[in-house]
Amino acid sequence: MTDLKKAAQRGIELMDLTTLNDDDTDQKVIDLCHKAKSPAGNTAAICIYPRFIPIARKTLNELDCEDIKIATVTNFPHGNDDIAIAVLETRAAVAYGADEVDVVFPYRALMDGNETVGFEMVKACKEECGDDAILKVIIESGVLKDPALIRKASELAIDAGADFIKTSTGKVPVNATLEAAEIMLTVISEKNRNVGFKPAGGVRDAAQTAEFLDLAARILGDDWVTPQTFRFGASSLLNSLLHTLELVDAPKPTSGY
């Protein structure tokens, strides 16, 4: 995909516009909702901490943007192996009104050789979501590093009922990479094409957006790359893509997600 403007437009339509900072406030989330209603069209979703779901829902309704989904996070960001806590957090997120829940897989337990706890956690959290929310599972590929572990985490998450597998929390040094994406997309192609993929963190501009879109299209077909099965998790990417589309001035450098 050499047409960067086309990649930028698709990237916005596939974006989970994210703020997951310790200093988030109601006003920052309100501002995020306004940004999600971008000059190039709405993002697919916003991703915020659970306590901000009510104000986000109110704001999106006021903006006549009910089509923008609200995603949130649980077992975040450390991916602990306490299933009960992950389940309680997921239950609360759904009760708050989340459309989508991004749960962190207990990746360190997997690195220690425990495959069971991750499977059981995803299965239990999926049951909490029921028909009310979709479940995205963050495997933290940048910490797993080993291709075999990235593959195993992806397989376990899908086998346990994940609707999406997601690379990263954005809270570790290495986030989405093309190498991890290729492994995860290949597992999806082998196990269940209805499962989605979400690279998160580290995608900075239209050129990188195009690389991930091209990779997904090569493995699963261009018609697979829709908001139902592909999302970008990002905060600073939106302004960069809008700049590519010549809709805003050049964005300021950022070290954010």
From Swiss-Prot:
The UniProt record lists the keyword Cytoplasm: yes
Subcellular location(s) of the protein: Cytoplasm
Annotated catalysed reactions: 2-deoxy-D-ribose 5-phosphate = D-glyceraldehyde 3-phosphate + acetaldehyde
NCBIfam families in alphabetical order: deoC
Pfam families from the UniProt entry: DeoC
GO MF annotation list: deoxyribose-phosphate aldolase activity
Function: Catalyzes a reversible aldol reaction between acetaldehyde and D-glyceraldehyde 3-phosphate to generate 2-deoxy-D-ribose 5-phosphate.
InterPro entries named in the record: Aldolase_TIM, DeoC, DeoC/FbaB/LacD_aldolase, DeoC_typeII
HAMAP family given in the database record: DeoC_type2
EC id: 4.1.2.4
Known pathway: Carbohydrate degradation; 2-deoxy-D-ribose 1-phosphate degradation; D-glyceraldehyde 3-phosphate and acetaldehyde from 2-deoxy-alpha-D-ribose 1-phosphate: step 2/2
Keywords: Cytoplasm, Lyase, Schiff base
Record: active site: D102 (proton donor/acceptor), K166 (schiff-base intermediate with acetaldehyde), K198 (proton donor/acceptor)
A single Gene Ontology CC term: cytoplasm
Similarity comment: Belongs to the DeoC/FbaB aldolase family. DeoC type 2 subfamily.
Main location per the UniProt record: cytoplasm
Name this protein carries in UniProt: Deoxyribose-phosphate aldolase
CDD domains, per database record: DeoC
Organism: Shewanella frigidimarina (strain NCIMB 400)
Gene Ontology terms: biological process: 2-deoxyribose 1-phosphate catabolic process; carbohydrate catabolic process; deoxyribonucleotide catabolic process
Signal peptide boundaries: none
PANTHER family on file: DEOXYRIBOSE-PHOSPHATE ALDOLASE
